[in-house]
Amino acid sequence: VTRFRPCIDLHGGRVKQIVGGTLTQDGVSLRTNFVSDRGAAWYADLYRRDGLSGGHVIKLGPGNDHVAREALAAWPGGLQVGGGMTPENAEEWISSGASHVIVTSCLFDAEGTLRMDRLKDLVSAVGAERLVLDLSCRRVQGGWAVAMNRWQTLTELRVTAETLDVLAEYCAEFLIHAADVEGLCTGIDRELVEMLGNWRRLPMTYAGGISRIQDIDEIDALSGGTMDATVGSALDLFGGGLIRYGDLVARQRGKSGTETV
């Protein structure tokens, strides 16, 4: 069954929810949906108490290492961490309490070409069983292309079943943000979910556009329950008015809790 995987998105040392396609190097075009008064460790402890394992801490740019470590310390082994991961620092983040490290940009050169040697270096550093490959993507003609550098740069790698087959040998899970709909609360990229949901070889988590619990049910149906889901800006926990966090916890526990606000 499709599980709810919680998230802690960090930007400038604060827990935030941002519109996915607006995060640039200079920050001028940044659109923020929510900035929390609570620290990352508060969220990590909440997820721990509610038994929501497998969530992710994402560091969006510099100035987030300290708060990310605080979150991991609040739930050792309960959260994955991503953002700026390299073969050189990955083991350090595992030692800090991350269950897995999440990688994207370091797998590509400046031109957006996949560097299999870097992927193999990461496997050597922490093991495939500790690696989550973030294939967050944007729509291009004929499909989806993996996006790197805060989702601003399209790589040459297309998100296809063939790509997943090749990369599956080097990781434990995939994380897929549909960057075009991330943070907009306008519904999921159904075609992307359908394509990914037919693959089913490794655990996979989808994020992007979820605005009601029925979206999670749809992901469940399209993937045969093999794909998990992350909810961000729609969630009351992050200032949203569309989905109650308590309903997602209840759903996970097999109770009825499917009303939306």
Model-derived regions, located:
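Short beta-strand/loop segments at the ligand-binding rim of alpha/beta enzyme cores
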Residues: 3, 72-81, 128-132, 143-152, ...
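Conserved anion-binding
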Residues: 11, 15-26, 94-181
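Catalytic cores of alpha/beta
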Residues: 66-101, 191-229, 245
